[in-house]
């Protein structure tokens, strides 16, 4: 089955790299649409909390977070090894501005290097 059909039929496995203000709500939106999601974040404290169903973004209501984890629809990792099992990878990492108001792309570059180790 090609990727388009997997997405249409909700069979695509999604990886979200970065589970902060953008990544976690995006992962949750995919989960609510019945996709299987792997969330990757290098912050071990955050991944431990999320694995226990603890919402790390208090301003958001993620009422089904524990359910998605219990049903194994949402797997949380702090390394990139599981990336080889997904169909779609979405980067949601920071791009903070430096003193010259230029984006720091190091998070994107480092994530891409890690992802490249596990591409099919």
Please give the residue ranges for each predicted region.
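Structural/interface elements that position substrates and couple domains in central-metabolism enzymes
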Residues: 1-120
